[in-house]
Amino acid sequence: MIPWLEADDPFPHVSSALTEADGAAGLLAAGADLSTGRLLQAYKHGIFPWFSEGQPILWWSTDPRMVLFVENFRISASLKKKLKKIHHSITSRDGQWEIRFDHAFEEVMRACAAPRNGEGGTWISDEIIAGYTGLHKLGYAHSSELWLQGKLVGAAYGVSIGQMFYGESMFARVPDASKIALAYLVHFLRNHDVSMIDCQQETSHLATLGAAPIARTEFISRLRQAVSGPQISNWQPIALFPHD
């Protein structure tokens, strides 16, 4: 059994989360709300919400935890070629490609929520969107966006607390658009002394980008130090190839 949280109840310790033997590995609690205060409390303790339509709010702390150390981010040769093409387009100001941060945060979330490849909608409900746009307005949630001829074609978004970034979701409307947006995000975070991105759950796609699972105890230890760092305030893309 997991505890049901009322509005003012604190989260249980992450060590009490269910295990694989319980049939819902990482499930910690249910209930409460998605207010900005509750979400910030959750992320600072290594907890995240994840639930489907019709379910109560479910809170998770997975073990192991999938993370991307920014120094391990993998850029394939083909992706690097695309990144250079986009870099030259941006620097020449030809009006084709643009990288923007936080220009259309809610639009990014709704694009991430849209059905993909004939599947149903994602876990990103209107309730989730409202909660995270609230964080965005307070400077705690951000998007890295790729634009082509004035249209949003790909992005990644997540939560930023101190020197910790929590990746939430990505989408692409043209090939590799989400990877390109992520590459600019990782580059920006590296330049602001962020060493680790929380990816929450293990997937083969994240592994190809350099993410790997670590023990929850190690994750929480690193997290505590990172969230106590200074909050990043100047969210502007940084050129990937400054000398080209």
UniProtKB/Swiss-Prot annotation:
It is found in: Cytoplasm. The keyword Transcription regulation does not apply. GO terms for cellular component: cytoplasm. It catalyses: N-terminal L-lysyl-[protein] + L-leucyl-tRNA(Leu) = N-terminal L-leucyl-L-lysyl-[protein] + tRNA(Leu) + H(+); N-terminal L-arginyl-[protein] + L-leucyl-tRNA(Leu) = N-terminal L-leucyl-L-arginyl-[protein] + tRNA(Leu) + H(+); L-phenylalanyl-tRNA(Phe) + an N-terminal L-alpha-aminoacyl-[protein] = an N-terminal L-phenylalanyl-L-alpha-aminoacyl-[protein] + tRNA(Phe). Keywords: Acyltransferase, Cytoplasm, Transferase. One of its GO terms (molecular function) is leucyl-tRNA--protein transferase activity. Its main location: cytoplasm. Belongs to the L/F-transferase family. It comes from Janthinobacterium sp. (strain Marseille) (Minibacterium massiliensis). Transmembrane segments: none annotated. Functions in the N-end rule pathway of protein degradation where it conjugates Leu, Phe and, less efficiently, Met from aminoacyl-tRNAs to the N-termini of proteins containing an N-terminal arginine or lysine. The keyword Repressor does not apply. HAMAP family: Leu_Phe_trans. Its EC number is 2.3.2.6. This is Leucyl/phenylalanyl-tRNA--protein transferase.
